[in-house]
Amino acid sequence: MKNKGAKQKLKRKGAASAFGCDLTEYLESSGQDVPYVLKSCAEFIETHGIVDGIYRLSGITSNIQRLRQEFGSDQCPDLTREVYLQDIHCVGSLCKLYFRELPNPLLTYELYEKFTEAVSHRPEEGQLARIQNVILELPPPHYRTLEYLIRHLAHIASFSSKTNMHARNLALVWAPNLLRSKKIEATICNGDAAFLAVRVQQVVIEFILNHADQIFNGGAPGALQQDESRTITKSLTLPALSLPMKLVSLEEAQARSLATNHPARKERRENSLPEIVPPPFHTVLELPDNKRKLSSKSKKWKSIFNLGRSGSDSKSKLSRNGSVFVRGQRLSVEKATIRPAKSMDSLCSVPVEGKENKGNFSRTVTTGGFFIPATKMHASSTGSSCDLSKEGEWGQEGMPAGAEGGCEVGGQIRPLPEQLKVFRPIGDPESEQSAPKLLGMFYTSSDSPGKSVFTSSLFQMEPSPRHQRKALNISEPFAVSVPLRVSAVISTNSTPCRTPPKELQSLSSLEEFSFQGSESGGWPEEEKPLGAESFPGSVTKKAATEDTKPEPEVPGRAECSQSPPLDPGTQVEKKTLHVSLGSQVSKEAEKRPKAEKVMEESQGASQPKPSTPQESLGAGTEPLILHEMDEEDLAQALIWPEIQQELKIIESEEEFSSLPPAAQKTSPIPESSPAPFPFPEAPGSLPSSSAPREVWTRDAANQSIQEAAILTDREKLEPVCSLLESESQQELSPDPASLAPLEMLLFEKVSSPARIEIGGPRNLSPPLTPAPPPPTPLEEEPEVLLSKEGPDREDAARDSRTDVYTEQPTPKESPGIPTPCQREEAIASPNEKQNARHAVPENKGPGLPSPTKEVDIIPQEEGGAPHSAQEPSDCDEDDTVTDPAQHGLEMVEPWEEPQWVTSPLHSPTLKEVQESQTQGSQGHRLERRLCHRPSLRQSHSLDSKTTGNSHWTLEAPFSSSCANLETERNYEPLQPPAARTKIAGLEEKALKAFREFSGLKGLEVLPSQKGPSGIQPKPVETNFMGLAEGKEQEPQLELSNRQMKHSDVPGPDSSKESSPRAQDSTLPGEHPLQLQLKNTECGPSKGKHRPSSLNLDSATPIADLFRLENGAPFSSPGIELSELGDTKVTWMSSSHCKAAPWNSQDTQDLDIVAHTLTGRRNSAPVSVSAVRTSFMVKMCQAKAVPVIPPKIQYTQIPQPLPSQSTGEGGAQPLERSQEEPGSTPEIPQKSTKDDSPSSLGSPEEEQPKQETGASASRRQASITSCMYEGSSCSPEPSASTLASTQDAVVQCRKRTSETEPSGDNLLSSKLERASGGPKAFHRSRPGRPQSLILFPIMDHLPSSPTVIDSKVLLSPIRSPTQTVSPGLLCGELAENTWITPEGVTLRNKMTIPKNGQRLETSTSCFYQPQRRSVILDGRSGRQIE
């Protein structure tokens, strides 16, 4: 079976072999009703083959070949021989091989389209009738054989409790052998097409299996009676396939088929390459379906062979496949329900793992099971929605609650092979049920029956989720476990594989799921109507709910109780991010602007929902459009972005409109769910697709308003367009030009929202105002914005999204990049959530902050993509629950952000931003203007404190904080004068405060955020458009209401309006410093942004984030925010800086990130971060020399200073920390002292501690990284830059580490750090970034600057809260509890002993996400995973 060539040769050699002979000819010549091979194999298997994984597992190749020869030589092999009894799977493999080698498949080529169409018919009854009619068209021999085979398989499925092979799994393994498309075989090399085809084929076969009695009872006689007439049909269906009626040798038959004009044989031959290498689906006896689906395009066949061949033992298969399979098994183990992990795992271990980790989300795994070529359906906006539902339905079959996954839709829509494969649609049970009704697609017919049958009727024996999951696993192509390299390539897919977040959704937010489902795609029925039907009418409703909810949510958010609601949004966003993975990052950027617009519109004409779908569109667009034109992207955006955005919609719409507080709470689960299921996101996206169009319609009304504002903004922004482009480039290194449009849209949208939301920021200024609601509004807003833009605007938005995504996807598509992007996206997701939350408050109040947040989201998204990838992994591992919190991180500010130490992801954005900065101060100013809008982005970014963090995030995304702030400033002028002034004032004050308290304030913000005013950060973010300012203000708002004073958070309008120029002038000074530093860092940052380390950290943080569950797991900045609002912002800056470098090094970094993301389980990335951390710690310690960057800069980048090798790192971090305390006397000091110890560790006390220490260090690392690098470059351009890069990397890593501890800080870290001391911190920090396995692999890659950077980055990730010493990131981990500046050396030492500690940390770090979820389980939680 594996050796197809040999088999084919045997086939040709076997003179009178039934193999490779046309079925009709063979049966006519042999006088048999059904092929003897099938009959004998089926009888044998029914007697002896009721074993685990029958038909899924592959037999021994030699035995298969021997059997084939015996059957071919007219012998009647004795299957009861010991050799075959010992290798029962060889008989099943032979049976599949026979059908795979048929010149014309059992379900003929001619009827392929009819089958797929019949199955896509919506009503099940209609499907049944259609399928029955199509089956009756089969030639009589094919009909009889099909009936025999289907009855046999249905009988085998009845033993699914023993075999773990229910109808879905059997359909998955058999579909490629029975149903093939010439077109697909012609393009057999196309993994995407093959995967999609397998999904469709699986749906068809599953449907037939589930309805075998109805189809063949009534139809069989007719079919048989029609034998004569059918003979005629046969010639039609089987073009002269049966030339000679006599039985000819295989060689002869094949030669004839090739030589003759038999299209089937001929085409099959050509398409599948030589018959020796039959179509990929048929390449492997057992594994063809699953393996094909699971493995990536390039590695598909090999992976398939490995997967199938792994042996009859599913566990061994898991082992063989490596990280993925092992994970799958682990998941299956984790999911008690899916005891059949063996068979399932081998088929889709990765998805299983993530889902199983989720535990309750195992259903999600099932739901994500198949990728139907939703692309078709997606092409039509409405269709895409339907597709999504179906997809969700499909995926949901296995899990009722995992319906939220809209991510798969994205994958389906988009042909991205890896992403598609990885994307797994997850629908909740309701969605599942409603999917068939709501969405007529391939999935629908198969899904509905599959779901029903599989979950309930068909296999009542295995009603438990285990069977469902099992089925899911098998049917999920992305579930395939692949080597690290493959996973790197598939990292994007891998991220989608992180269905766990979606599963988390399904598990945690079942109730909310229904609401989110509609947006998700695989949402419950009520949800679906929400997504599709509700869009026109619901849009307003949702907008209204959004507007109203913001206030209720805000309080919740302040209290962390909002955390669940926010989490849902965040998780949804996460899903979206995952779905988009890389693409969503860019799209998110575009979405954010659109979201801003939506915000605006929401304010004017509540249309958050429309915005969401479009947001989805945008998100999905990026992957679709990797580097395509805007228009193309737009077209694709409709499909793919919608998928992605649908996920977002899930969070926003569901949260707000359907599930005000409860929904939001539920949202977290969906939110986290997406990470692993970016694939699940696809389903959500699908509905989004249709929703966006609907949105356009409803947006039409608001369109005029928004368009007017946007047009004005656009006009203003047009000049900024180039700058935006630069920023975009930095953000998404791939396509600056494409990004520019996105940025433009963003800013345009931002500006109008800014104007509208001017009043809002004030109102939102209260920390809790924005909290929960904003995520929804923001998420919805993007779509609304899109719709409001109208077709033109939408197109532009889409184009920009597409461009951005195109840019980002390029790196993401790169084997490595997809994961980093995903992670960044994940990071962005939390930030987006924040933005959304802020947007909601802004919806309540002004629309300006919302835009800012949206913009912020873009950079974060970039960071979030990699993070998202990582997140999925976490989600997969029982982090889904936490993930929602983290997704709703914005909601649970502290947790979410610290948790998601996706700073590496963010770092890339920051780096890109820095790069943009390098492009020009003017560009920076413009960027800053954009940044103001990006302030929304900020919110979106992981910085839970939306304002401050957003500011930084924006900075990061746009060249540099300087540039960002300046851009914001410049942009503000574009904004209405009032808005501008408000922004300027806010930014100025915030910037100052932020710079001054960047380390401390972040810390204080975090504590405030985390404890007293968890929501405050959001309001702050909402209030500001400026990144730094917002960030700073948020801390001020939260901790000392400084923001209100500075930027009149209550009256941001007046503040910003009053001092737009003042801010410009002030910020320029501050920003220039920052700008320089960031620019400087930009160069080093690229080295720094080593995704590998970051990713590893991110990957670990994913778990941590999930662990935080309350906190923001999305991005390390977000996590930092959790720990310290401002610190996270700093993280974002650093992260973004790295993110830009990431993008520059996207392939490399993304590769690493991909490894990390796909292989958080792979551990290699983690270890890399750990090793790098130690290495960087050593280097940084040696290099650490006190260099004092501008105070402002220092405030913003306290930690990076230590990180800097130039020595400014060590001294400056102290200075910065001190400065920060000075600036923020109360909180900053507290932050500096306490942040590192227990920023996240203790809710309020420890959090302040850690926030101060960790935040200060983080911020210092981040700021030092970004700003300080500039400084560093000045004194020691090359050494400094190198050191800076490394430091920045270390900072990033610290952030990641911090993110890791962030999760701990929130829960375990609180306890551990409070009492654990440096060791606990070390475990926490190094642990997350470093996995035991990962550590050894990548740990010792410090030789290259990139590696060093990675190490540095890993180090920050490791000690996210204690980013005090960038250079001592590891040391910071060790020291994590105290002294940001001094701790550098100590921390370095602690980190240096990575070997012993690594093991410790690796388990704890690996299981950190759980730690986030469970305080006590912080260290062990990850291990549990």
UniProtKB/Swiss-Prot annotation:
Changing residue 169 to V: 70% reduction of GAP activity. This is Rho GTPase-activating protein 31. Residues 258-277, 511-621, 652-700, 756-951, 1031-1095, 1196-1260, 1291-1327 are annotated as: Disordered. Signal peptide: none annotated. Interacts with ITSN1, which inhibits GAP activity. Interacts with PARVA. Interacts with GTP-loaded RHOU. The modification Phosphoserine is found at residues 272, 343, 346, 384, 464, 685, 690, 765, 961, 1092-1093, 1163. The keyword Ligase does not apply. Residues 21-216 form the Rho-GAP domain. The modification Phosphothreonine is found at residues 283, 666, 769, 776. The lineage of its organism: Eukaryota, Metazoa, Chordata, Craniata, Vertebrata. It comes from Mus musculus. It is found in: Cell projection, Lamellipodium; Cell junction, Focal adhesion.
